[in-house]
From Swiss-Prot:
F-type ATPases have 2 components, CF(1) - the catalytic core - and CF(0) - the membrane proton channel. CF(1) has five subunits: alpha(3), beta(3), gamma(1), delta(1), epsilon(1). CF(0) has three main subunits: a(1), b(2) and c(9-12). The alpha and beta chains form an alternating ring which encloses part of the gamma chain. CF(1) is attached to CF(0) by a central stalk formed by the gamma and epsilon chains, while a peripheral stalk is formed by the delta and b chains. One of its GO terms (cellular component) is proton-transporting ATP synthase complex. Gene3D superfamilies: 2.40.30.20, ATP synthase alpha/beta chain, C-terminal domain, P-loop containing nucleotide triphosphate hydrolases. It is an enzyme of class 7 (translocase). It comes from Fuscovulum blasticum (Rhodobacter blasticus). This is ATP synthase subunit alpha. Keywords: ATP synthesis, ATP-binding, Cell inner membrane, Cell membrane, CF(1), Hydrogen ion transport, Ion transport, Membrane, Nucleotide-binding, Translocase, Transport. InterPro entries: ATP_synth_asu-like_sf, ATP_synth_asu_C, ATP_synth_asu_C_sf, ATP_synth_F1_a_nt-bd_dom, ATP_synth_F1_asu, ATPase_a/bsu_AS, ATPase_F1/V1/A1_a/bsu_N, ATPase_F1/V1/A1_a/bsu_N_sf. NCBIfam families: atpA, PRK13343.1.
């Protein structure tokens, strides 16, 4: 069967008609050298600082050093698959990550890719990872409490929604435990809020440079307690390249800002920023940027300040949302005057200082109440907590002062002895096991008992037993009181004080 000439011409005409005149233009460069996660690229004349570029095989990188004759690019992945002479394409986009409700309950890497094996992420939008912090006009003073469920923190170092409170201490002093308990504590409040988004608090936990097993344990705990429903975990583990560890906090913050900008509340936990600074130092030195103090680059302060300034309380015209930050810093042998610790202390609105000495004495959470402060103060406390917490802080401060002197003298007058006895019991009362956060009303009742002499006759070793018994009593027979305190926040005075005293008297009578 022969093909007719007319058919051939028709086919040719069809082909010509469908010929695309649009040529795809891609700006490309060539790899000059690659190693240690850094690629030097010739070309890419119009690349922006912080722009994503693409290597063969889909490996991504970010342009950081724009020099006269080459571009320094950090690689988000394994550099073993990249070789000299490879072409590098511009993507014309700054690093961005998925954001939205679809990320809740998921574990993602620093680029927002899922790493939990639960399938693709359904994101409602994409957000640029490193954006400018809100200005002065959209902000409002911090005035709503962000309950951690820890007696020592909520009573003496209150944290408000929109605050940045640093958790600082040596390794193995319970820094992550404080942050994790704070996440677990939100479950009660989120469940009680129902559909009221203005009361809920969503959590974003950023793990930087940690072991994968540690992150897996944490996620397992969150899933077991049902806390994963309102939590996103961003993980750049120890086996990930330094650029991923550098980027993870920015990506996590972009995910948290989705809630802040939609009139909701979110909590950011950066665990920990010391490792991000180390990753940034590694990148900077390999890019041949000049080193400064402790070999960190000169802009390591700006690295942390631009990250933490994004946590803010917005005013009503901007949706009244908030982003609270709990950055964690690891110190070496309690040295809080090192470079990174002093930087982050000066950026944040207070710090919770955890001491290994207290930890080994069995005082856990090992909060040093003398060195820990909250620069927001009582404006971030409920009225009930405010009315009982002032006294406990003062009594513990006096106790610490007296305890130092009491070592030298044996003959102490009655008032000093009473102060020491009360202080020892209050110190014991501030202890709290992990994974057992308490509600605001429960903490108020416990501290009221401690500061109003209910423990003075109880032996120090029995304080924990007294507290456990009191909690059981309040959760069963005193449930109406707790519910009333939760619903109607007011000063502990008048009728409320009488009601609390009645419950305490009823319990103390049977306690033996």
């Amino acid at each position: 069967m022969g093909i007719q000439a007319a058919e051939i011409s028709a086919i040719l005409k069809e082909q010509i008609k469908n010929f695309g005149k649009d040529a795809e233009v891609a700006e490309v460069g060539r790899v000059l050298s690659v190693g240690d996660g850094i690629a030097r690229v010739y070309g890419l004349d119009n690349v922006q600082a912080g722009e994503m570029v693409e290597f063969p095989g889909g490996i991504r990188g970010m342009a950081l050093n724009l020099e006269v004759d080459n571009v320094g690019i950090v690689i988000f992945g394994d550099d073993r698959d990249i070789k000299e002479g490879d072409t590098v394409k511009r993507t014309k986009s700054i690093v961005d990550v998925p954001a939205g409700n679809g990320l809740l309950g998921r574990v993602v890497d620093a680029l927002g890719n899922p790493i939990d094996g639960k399938g693709p992420i359904v994101a409602s939008e994409r957000r640029i990872a490193d954006v400018k912090a809100p200005g002065i006009i959209p902000r409002k003073g911090v005035h709503e409490p962000m309950a951690t469920g820890l007696k020592a923190v909520d009573a003496m170092i209150p944290i408000g929604r929109g605050q940045r409170e640093l958790i600082i201490g040596d390794r193995q002093t319970g820094k992550t435990a404080v942050a994790l308990d704070t996440i677990l504590n939100q479950k009660v409040y989120n469940d009680a809020a129902g559909d009221d988004e203005s009361k809920k608090l969503y959590c974003v936990y950023v793990a930087i440079g940690q072991k994968r097993s540690t992150v897996a344990q944490l996620v397992k705990k969150l899933e077991e307690t049902g806390a994963m429903a309102y939590t996103v975990v961003v993980a750049a583990t120890a086996s990930d390249p330094a650029p991923m560890q550098f980027l993870a906090p920015f990506s996590g913050t972009a995910i948290g800002e989705f809630f802040r900008d939609n009139g909701r509340h979110a909590l950011m936990i950066y665990d920990d920023l010391s490792k991000q600074a180390v990753a940034y130092r590694q990148m900077s030195l390999l890019l041949r940027r000049p080193p400064g103090r402790e070999a960190y680059p000169g802009d390591v302060f700006y690295l942390h300040s631009r990250l933490l300034e994004r946590s803010a309380k917005m005013n009503g015209d901007f949706g009244a949302g908030s982003l609270t930050a709990l950055p964690i810093i690891e110190t070496q042998a309690g040295d809080i005057s090192a470079y990174i610790p002093t930087n982050v202390i000066s950026i944040t609105d207070g710090q919770i200082f955890l001491e290994s000495e207290l930890f080994y004495q069995g005082i856990r959470p090992a909060v040093n109440t003398g060195l820990s402060v909250s620069r927001v103060g009582s404006s971030a406390q409920t009225s009930a907590m405010k009315s009982v917490a002032g006294k406990v802080k003062l009594e513990l401060a006096q106790y610490r002062e007296m305890a130092a002197f009491a070592q030298f003298g044996s003959d102490l007058d009655a008032s000093t002895q009473a102060l020491l006895n009360r202080g020892a019991r209050l110190t014991e009362l501030m202890k709290q096991p992990q994974y057992s956060p308490l509600t605001n009303a429960e903490i108020v009742c416990i501290i009221f008992a401690g500061t109003n002499g209910y423990l003075d006759k109880v032996a120090v070793r029995d304080v924990g037993r007294f507290e456990a018994g009191l909690l059981k009593h309040l959760r069963t027979k005193g449930k109406a009181l707790l519910d009333d305190m939760t619903k109607n926040d007011r000063k502990v005075a008048g009728d409320l004080e009488k009601a609390i005293r009645a419950e305490l008297d009823a319990f103390a009578k049977d306690f033996a």
